[in-house]
Curated annotation (Swiss-Prot):
Enzyme class: transferase
Purpose: Catalyzes the final step of fatty acid oxidation in which acetyl-CoA is released and the CoA ester of a fatty acid two carbons shorter is formed.
GO molecular function: acetyl-CoA C-acyltransferase activity
Keywords: Acyltransferase, Cytoplasm, Fatty acid metabolism, Lipid degradation, Lipid metabolism, Transferase
Name of this chain's protein: 3-ketoacyl-CoA thiolase
Tree of life domain: Bacteria
Catalytic activity: an acyl-CoA + acetyl-CoA = a 3-oxoacyl-CoA + CoA
Any one of the GO BP annotations: fatty acid beta-oxidation
Cellular location(s): Cytoplasm
Record has Acyltransferase as a keyword: yes
EC number, UniProt record: 2.3.1.16
Pathway(s): Lipid metabolism; fatty acid beta-oxidation
Length: 436
């Protein structure tokens, strides 16, 4: 049995990435303060449909995701359908795979096209760190349920008497891994120590990311894939990512204190992605349908893979596990790739993965391979800057990576690109695209 992955439908049509779009990414409580993930999702999908000049009724499926769930609208995909003029009967469902969520939604739509169930679909993801579901303590939640069942005044009073003042305080969303209690930043510190990633190297990667992102924006290369967003009260608009340090200097990074291990740590706020708001979307079609409608796709999906490892140690190594699977399924080696886009959740995480890509020992002991995945050529790596600069709205990042690498390959005359990301829960995702 061949290890090659056939990312086609029964007619032999490839899965076309027709176009992609995102909102600008904004730091928490700035330009999108008060704007929900759902509203950003509707905004970007509406604009995607408008720019592609496609009748919304043509969309047969929408798969969309968010990581920070909205209790009021748990099926964000269905709400987007209802808010964007699509046919009321359009199939829509929501997914979540932590920071790889829009990788998952893209694959789900692609697989629907591969099976022949649909010809046209939209995938994507949205997250808000500014509109959060603020919870209550477990004791108060338990009491509120009991209160709903209490019949007499005395029973209700007894419930209130067992609550202390601290039980009434609001509980913000958890930032720690449920299984381990470790935050992502603590995991990044863990990885920096395990793989001997220096503070200087982390600072250098962050500086590189911001510098390249600044150059990319100033060149105009992101204009076609980032929309201008107008949000209430409509007194201003945002048309550019606002986390990028346009005057980044390597000296400024050295002044920052460690953020997660104050005494012995090396991971700082500048070498970590900030809490970010934003949304993204990708229009996918079967190759023949795209051409029949007159589109020139920005790329095609060649292969994809997901992975999972233990969460207790270095759980953000997902790219090192998912990438070799995607490469094998594409019949390729790392050196065959034209460009590599890796999510920079933390500089330490990205550098640890890059280091292990080149490690034969890691390949033998962890992957069961005889040779290393390969050494990453920095002339191919995150050439437009990465998440450290652009920011990271959890569910939107995967679609940003896919769209960005396809458009850059198009500008370079074609080739193949790897997009890969780590995710909470020890998860990893990788997708290889080809561009003509």
């Amino acid at each position: 049995m061949s290890d090659r992955q056939q990312v086609t439908n029964a007619k032999g049509d490839r899965i076309a990435i027709v176009t992609g779009l995102r909102t600008p990414f904004a730091k928490q409580a700035t330009a999108f303060h008060g704007v929900s993930a759902l509203d950003m999702g509707k905004m970007v999908v509406n604009e995607l449909l408008s720019r592609s000049e496609l009748d919304p009724k043509e969309i047969q499926q929408l798969v969309y995701g968010q990581v920070v769930q909205m209790p009021a609208a748990p099926n964000i995909a269905r709400e987007i359908v209802l808010g964007t003029g699509m046919d009321i009967a359009t199939d829509a469902y929501s997914v979540t795979r932590a920071c790889a969520t829009s990788f998952q939604s893209t694959v789900n739509v692609a697989e629907s096209i591969m099976t022949g169930n649909i010809d046209i679909g939209i995938a994507g993801g949205s997250d808000s760190s500014s509109v959060l579901p603020i919870g209550v303590s477990k004791k108060l939640a338990h009491g509120l349920v009991d209160l709903n069942k209490a019949r007499s005044f005395g029973q209700k009073l007894a419930i209130f008497r067992r609550l202390g003042l601290k039980d009434l305080l609001p509980v913000p969303p958890a930032v720690a891994e449920y299984s381990t209690g470790l935050s992502m930043g603590q995991t990044a510190e863990q990885m920096a120590k395990t793989y001997n990633i220096s503070r200087a190297d982390q600072d250098a990667l962050a500086h590189r990311s911001h510098s390249l992102a600044t150059e990319t924006w100033n060149s105009g290369n992101l204009a076609q894939e980032v929309m201008t967003a107008h949000v209430p009260p409509y007194k201003a608009f945002i048309d550019r990512d606002n986390n990028i340090r346009e005057n980044s200097s390597i000296e400024s990074y050295a002044k920052l204190r460690p953020a997660f291990d104050r005494k012995h740590g090396t991971v700082t706020a500048a070498t970590s992605t900030p809490l970010t708001d934003g949304a993204s979307a990708i229009l996918l079609m079967s190759e023949s349908r795209a051409k029949a409608l007159g589109y020139n796709p920005i790329g095609y999906i060649k292969s994809y893979a997901f992975s999972a490892i233990d969460v207790w140690e270095d759980m953000l190594m997902g790219p090192s596990y998912a990438t070799p699977i995607a490469l094998k399924r594409a019949g390729m080696e790392l050196e065959d790739l034209t460009l590599i886009e890796m999510h920079e959740a933390f500089a330490a995480q990205a550098l640890a993965n890059m280091k292990m890509f080149a490690s034969k020992k890691f390949a033998q002991e962890k992957l069961g391979r005889n040779r290393a995945i390969g050494e990453i050529d920095m002339n191919k790596f995150n050439v437009l800057g990465g998440s450290l600069a652009y920011g990271h709205p959890f569910a939107a990042t995967g679609a940003r990576l896919i769209t960005q690498v396809c458009n850059e390959l198009k500008r370079r005359g074609g080739g193949t690109g790897l997009t890969t990301a780590c995710a909470a829960g020890g998860l990893g995702a990788a997708m290889i695209v080809e561009v003509e």
